[in-house]
Design a protein with these regions (language model features):
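N-terminal flexible segment immediately upstream of the FAD-binding catalytic core
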Residues: 1-64, 78-109, 257-275, 310-329, ...
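A gly/ser-rich beta-alpha-beta helix-loop segment of oxidoreductase catalytic cores
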Residues: 42, 82, 87, 126-170, ...
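N-terminal glycine-rich flavin-associated loop
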Residues: 17, 41-73, 91, 95-137, ...
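Activity-critical C-terminal alpha-helical subdomain
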Residues: 388, 489-538
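Non-heme iron-sulfur electron-transfer modules
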Residues: 522, 559-594, 615-640, 932-939
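Iron-sulfur cluster-binding electron-transfer modules in prokaryotic oxidoreductases
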Residues: 511, 619-959
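Iron-sulfur cluster-binding cysteine motifs and their immediate structural context
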Residues: 518-520, 551-575, 601-628, 808, ...
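Ferredoxin-like iron-sulfur electron-transfer modules
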Residues: 528-548, 582-604
Length: 959
């Protein structure tokens, strides 16, 4: 047990840290400590201080400051680890977005990465070289390099040959006393050997001690035939003799208990361009396991095993093969994938695989295919299993995913014994799947911790699992998820007294004060795995399925400003728990924090739902909670909805007044006056910015009347924003979007139909975002009826010129109508009738969150590339955070969401494009260049395709 630390020491530490670190990044507020302290594991420790550090100097300073006061600390990257290795009741050190540096080296053969780089981003940087990093954890779209290396994470294809231990080239390390070593720098190494001879000699002594014990040496070599992340990487002591190499490899998988990895260089691996997958079903686990042994000798990259219960858990999911629902629980499936550099080689490999399996009876199958939709469905089966259990669990329980490895020759027996333990301890919902080539199995089950009897059941179950895996089959209790707190009590059981003693010596050598992440890997408390368990109280059925995995966080626009979706749910659960126990939270710090950080700064655009493994849209909860907050404004809102034409006329008048004032007084004077008023009103008036749109004075109805008639027709619904907002004064093309849209439709030869009473229509989003569901639904219904009539019962396509309106209408409408935003309409209907002459120009492209949710990201990029020679989609900006009117009312959300935009705009780039008029205001403001609808770009490069061309030319891919 770690001894308690006096509060005065934390107060002293806070004062010391504040002398060199921005106090806003030193978090001591209770609610934020709770939110920031949560990770994906089922353990709950609340840190006393959370640090968000932006530089190596700050990390060194924090480590040394903690060391001076004897205060322990823990490092956290993305917080997706599952074994409790990234929670702390002391000081939690996290990193800002400043730690995303990367350098591709040797034409992609190596890559240098800072710990804040997301794994998938590293692969994106390597993609042009047909390379990738070796580790491929399931959380790769969220987890960061720091965690990947510190946990020695692997994955489906990685195995033991391509994990961090095998592919690390070198790293920069900060030790427990703040000393820095760069193992890639000869001068740094020479200095280290001289100044830290104690560490060098200590490592050498450990190697000698290990090699002198032939039995232990053989045990180490034997155990690392399998995936193994239980304890420290003892194989480093037998694989290497150079102390620097030993040290480097000991850091891999050390879970922040030996030092901080400040950056790392990996040897990369080939990313094959050609892949094929097959689903093969066998009558039972024995036959499937025998097939795995056969497959290990064939050219396969991945073999995923799924037991009968696992298959049953996803049988009713959309797109699943029909035969899955008919399989009995004895069945077992293998999802097999093969990779090759060319199509012919891949075809030959697939034939070799199936030929090798001829002696087995395959009762059902989806044959090898490279067709993207089918492949996605097949891997959707495997990836959907963990969330499938999570989605149906009882409220108040958590989902636990354990991670073991059996010798492959004992795979079937191990599965049978695990299934017997499920029955013994009444885990009827438990499923098994995993990376069969490595004997690495995951089993998933639900567990409540609200009763002592449930905690004891879990404890007894884990005792039996440990005995089964580590003793009976001599396997690994943690194959790839890391030891953490979860398996720390069993490390000695798996490794024996000598192996465990060696690990204790490693810890003492690197961290003599035991300040680095105490309780992780080395823990004398035999009950640590059933202590400090995270409560999962019922909060709201919209979010009760949340497993707090954190997959949502990278796409959230408020994650660096206030809270992420995971953190919002954590705080709301705590609020509800306190309410349930009768505590008055009405004026508590937690309630006040949640009001602004949880509700006001949530964009509620739902990108989190796209990343959530169980499909939770935290924005839906936020909008529901906003209902009470905005209830007093409901009468005003209802009046505006019923008099929408008058409301928009007032808005347009306001834009005209701003336009006139700016012309007469100048931008600087108007800005000073309006933003001064905002300060006086404490943010109750909207932010003014130079990019404010002018009023749209285009007479749309009259213009439509003057267009020629055609047998090609489209219904056009300009959004409220498009109808009323013109362009900013600095935009090159000053035409309103409505005029540009008509120009493009006319070039393509389409007749335009407007719905009746156009100025009174709205999709309802402004009301929905405030939680005024009834009013929002009423407006949506009114619009649906008008569009149904205008499209002659859905006969003609309908264009909504901003993507948020299109997305909401698609979701809300019940009548069969084809609703399209600009990219969809141009791609599907207009391009066949246009010829594009692309500009030799670099442009910026922002893909809105609604476009992403509609699955249009690739289509939008493809269209932009057909219109301009270079298209830049800025990194790390998923949602701009404008969120309807929040860019005016909560501008800090927009600023945080696009804070990295301006630095990504090249000097020779003068404009950007998107497909949401309001989003374009904030993008223009923060980028320094005007953003307009992508329809402006298409109209600029498009010309009508002649009738003779249409009849003789095949429609090209955006030619």
């Amino acid at each position: 047990m770690t001894p308690p630390i006096a509060d005065r020491l934390y107060q002293q530490l806070e004062q010391i840290l504040a002398s060199r670190i921005d106090p806003q990044r030193i978090i001591t507020q209770e609610a934020k400590r709770l939110a920031y302290g949560t990770d994906a594991s089922f353990y709950r420790l609340i840190p006393k201080i959370v640090l968000r550090l932006k530089s190596l100097d700050e990390v060194i300073f924090a480590i040394q400051s903690c060391g001076q006061l004897g205060i322990h600390f823990t490092f956290r990257a993305a917080g997706t680890s599952l074994s409790g290795q990234a929670v702390s009741d002391s000081v939690l050190i996290t990193l800002t977005d400043d730690w995303r540096g990367h350098e591709v080296q040797n034409q992609g053969l190596k890559i240098r990465l800072q710990p804040g780089v997301i794994g998938a981003d590293a692969n994106k940087y390597l993609a042009p070289f047909q390379r990738k990093i070796g580790p491929d954890p399931a959380s790769i779209n969220t987890c960061k390099i720091g965690g990947i290396a510190a946990n020695n994470a692997s994955g489906m294809c990685c195995g033991t040959a391509q994990n961090s231990y095998r592919t690390v080239d070198g790293m920069q390390i900060v030790f427990a006393d703040g000393y820095v070593l760069d193992t890639r720098d000869p001068e740094s190494v020479a200095r280290f050997k001289q100044e830290r001879a104690d560490l060098v000699e200590g490592i050498h002594a450990l190697c000698q001690e290990t090699l002198a014990n032939s039995e232990l040496t053989e045990r180490i070599r034997h155990k690392y035939r399998l995936k193994n992340t239980t304890g420290y990487a003892l194989n480093a002591l037998v694989d290497f003799s150079d102390p620097i190499e030993v040290l480097t490899h000991l850091m891999i998988g050390s879970e922040g208990t030996l030092g901080f990895i400040a950056d790392i260089t990996y040897h990369t691996v080939i990313e094959h361009a050609h892949k094929a997958s097959a689903l093969l079903v066998f009558a039972d686990i024995e036959q499937a396991s025998q097939a795995v042994t056969t497959l290990s000798k064939t050219p396969v990259a991945a073999v995923e095993m799924m037991d009968g219960r696992a298959l049953r858990s996803v049988a009713d999911k959309k797109g699943m093969p029909e035969f899955i629902a008919k399989l009995d629980l004895e069945a077992a499936a293998l999802l097999v994938e093969s990779h090759a550099s060319d199509a012919q080689t891949l075809h030959t490999q697939c034939e070799q695989v199936m030929s090798a399996l001829q002696r087995y009876q395959i009762i059902e199958s989806v044959p090898f295919t490279s067709e993207s939709k089918t492949v996605a469905t097949l891997w959707g089966i495997r990836k959907g299993m963990f969330p499938a259990v999570g989605a149906v669990r009882e409220v108040g329980t958590t989902v636990i995913i354990e991670d073991v490895a059996f010798p492959v020759e004992n795979l079937a027996a191990g599965v049978r014994d695990l299934q017997a333990l499920f029955d013994k301890y009444h885990y009827s919902e438990a499923i098994i799947f995993g990376h069969a080539l490595e004997g690495n199995l995951h089993f998933v089950f639900t567990q409540g911790f609200d009763k002592q009897s449930e905690i004891e059941r879990y404890g007894a179950f884990m005792d039996d699992v440990a005995e089964l895996v580590a003793v009976k089959y001599q396997g690994s209790l943690k194959a790839e998820h890391g030891t953490g707190r979860n398996m720390a009590p069993y490390v000695e059981l798996e490794w024996g007294k000598e192996g465990y003693a060696l690990m204790q010596k490693i810890k003492a050598l690197f961290d003599p004060k035991r300040l680095l992440n105490p309780g992780v890997i080395i823990n004398e408390d035999k009950h640590s795995h059933i202590s400090n368990l995270k409560p999962m109280p019922a909060a709201d059925n919209l979010v009760d399925r949340c497993i707090e995995c954190g997959f949502c966080e990278p796409v959230c626009p408020s994650r660096t400003l206030t809270l992420s979706p995971r953190q919002r749910i954590v705080l709301y659960r705590e609020l509800q728990r306190r309410r349930t126990t009768g505590e008055n939270v009405a004026s508590s710090e937690l309630e006040q924090v949640f009001e602004y950080q949880g509700l006001d700064t949530c964009a509620a655009t739902g990108l989190c739902a796209e990343r959530c493994p169980v499909g939770i849209n935290t924005g839906d909860l936020v909008k529901k909670l906003r209902t009470a907050k905005y209830q007093k404004f409901t009468p005003i809102a209802r009046w505006t909805a019923e008099h929408f034409s008058a409301t928009t006329t007032l808005a347009r008048t306001g834009l005209k007044a701003n336009q006139l004032a700016t012309k007469v007084l100048g931008e600087k004077s108007v800005g000073t006056m309006m933003n001064g008023l905002r300060r006086i009103s404490k943010g109750k008036t909207p932010l003014w910015m130079p990019e404010m749109p002018q009023a749209n004075t285009h007479s749309l109805e009259l213009a439509v009347e003057n267009l020629p008639r055609s047998d090609k027709k489209v219904v056009y619904l300009p959004s409220c924003a498009s109808r009323n907002m013109g362009q900013q004064a600095s935009a090159t093309d000053q035409r309103p979007l409505t005029e540009v849209t008509l120009s493009l439709l006319n070039k393509a030869g389409f007749e335009v139909i407007l719905p009746t009473e156009l100025s009174s229509h709205c999709c309802g989003m402004p009301y929905d975002s405030k939680g005024m569901t009834e009013i929002a639904q009423s407006k949506a219904q009114q619009l649906e009826n008008a569009l149904w009539q205008a499209s002659q019962g859905g006969h003609y396509p309908i264009l909504m010129d901003t993507s948020p309106c299109a997305k909401r209408s698609i979701e809300q409408f019940t009548k069969p109508m084809e609703i399209l935003e600009p990219t969809g309409l141009v791609s599907r209907y207009l391009l066949d009738h246009l010829t594009l002459a692309p500009k030799q120009e670099t442009i910026m492209l922002h893909v809105t969150c609604s476009s992403r949710r509609l699955g249009l990201e690739n289509d939008m990029l493809k269209l932009a590339k057909a219109c301009a020679s270079e298209v830049i989609v800025p990194e790390h900006i998923q949602c701009c955070g404008w969120a309807g009117d929040k860019g005016f009312t909560t501008p800090e959300l927009n600023a945080a969401a696009v804070h990295s935009l301006k630095e990504q705009v090249p000097a020779h780039c003068s404009r950007g494009f998107s497909n949401s008029r309001t989003c374009e205001i904030g993008l223009s403001h923060h980028s320094g260049i005007p953003y307009q609808s992508i329809l402006y770009l298409v109209d600029e490069v498009a010309r009508p395709r002649l009738a003779t061309q249409e009849s003789t030319e095949q429609p090209s891919e955006y030619a």
